[in-house]
Amino acid sequence: HSEGTFSNDYSKYLEDRKAQDFVRWLMNNKRSGAAE
């Protein structure tokens, strides 16, 4: 059970990381688009 909980928490952590990267990517795109 502890293994399942760990992998579940880890997948949640990865999802958060992906979300943050996506937001950063969006911000960069908006910035470069506005600069153009």
Curated annotation (Swiss-Prot):
Source taxon at top rank: Eukaryota
Keywords assigned: Hormone, Secreted
Single GO biological process annotation from the record: response to starvation
Induction profile: Produced in the A cells of the islets of Langerhans in response to a drop in blood sugar concentration.
GO terms for cellular component: extracellular region
Subcellular location: Secreted
SMART domains, A to Z: GLUCA
Residue stretches in coiled coil: none
UniProt GO molecular function: glucagon receptor binding; hormone activity
Presence of the UniProt keyword Cytoplasm in the record: no
Broad class of the protein's primary localization: secreted
PROSITE patterns to which the protein is assigned, alphabetical: GLUCAGON (PS00260)
Described function: Promotes hydrolysis of glycogen and lipids, and raises the blood sugar level.
Annotated family: Belongs to the glucagon family.
Protein name: Glucagon-1
Name of the coding gene: gcg1
